[in-house]
A protein has these predicted regions:
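Bacterial N-terminal signal peptides
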Residues: 1-7
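Sec/Tat signal peptide C-region and signal peptidase I cleavage site
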Residues: 9-13
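A short helix->beta-strand "capping" segment at the edge of beta-propeller domains
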Residues: 14-32, 123
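Surface loop/turn motifs at the tips and blade-to-blade linkers of beta-strand repeat domains
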Residues: 26-32, 68-76, 127-133
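Surface loops at the rim/top face of extracytoplasmic beta-rich domains
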Residues: 40, 46-53, 77, 90-169
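Beta-propeller domains
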Residues: 46-68
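Blade-loop segments of beta-propeller domains
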Residues: 63-88
Length: 169
């Protein structure tokens, strides 16, 4: 099995492997501001930067200088640019939207965009969720073989039955 790493700045040290059949290879460097997730679109990789709301493109193994999208996100706690998935040329993003980077949250939202190979265009709101907590906001996004999009929204810090414990604790 080959694991690819995307190195962020600043580096906190080299990866340490505990499995003999894993190989770590440096794929790209220079991604700042907390990459949270990535999606593969053909031979390209779209990478989310949590704190500044940018979506960066890795094309032919090279991190492109300009972002393909820059959204206003709040980045307090675990908020920010959180999840990405693709269906054909549609790209779905999940993030905590704000009026400006680092501002107060307007909501946790899912948007769809069209990917033209260069930039993300035609932004459409798909789902508007609550944004009451700065932690436990989820972020994982996947698609099934039929093109349906699934999203982990987290428990927003609301413990109890959400944890699937019979006694609610």
């Amino acid at each position: 099995m080959i694991l690819f790493t995307i190195l962020i700045v600043p580096a906190y040290g080299e990866p340490v492997l505990k499995e003999d059949d894993f190989v770590v290879q440096k794929f790209v460097s220079g991604i700042a501001n907390g990459p949270t997730s990535m999606a593969f679109e053909g031979k390209d990789i779209l990478v989310l930067q949590k704190t500044d709301g940018e979506v960066r493109l890795i094309h032919n193994g090279v991190l492109q200088e300009k972002p393909v999208l820059d959204e206003n996100v709040t980045s307090e706690g675990e908020q920010g640019m959180l999840g990405i998935t693709t269906v054909g040329t549609k790209v779905y993003l999940y993030f905590t939207e704000s009026t400006h980077d680092g501002g107060k949250p307007l909501g946790k939202r899912v948007y769809s965009y069209d990917w033209n190979g260069t930039v993300l265009t035609d932004k459409k709101l798909i789902k508007d969720l609550w944004a009451t907590q700065i932690y436990h906001n989820g972020g994982a996004m996947v698609t099934d073989l039929n093109g349906s999009v699934y999203l982990v929204v987290g428990d927003a810090g609301r413990y109890g039955k959400l944890q699937n414990h019979p006694d609610g604790e």
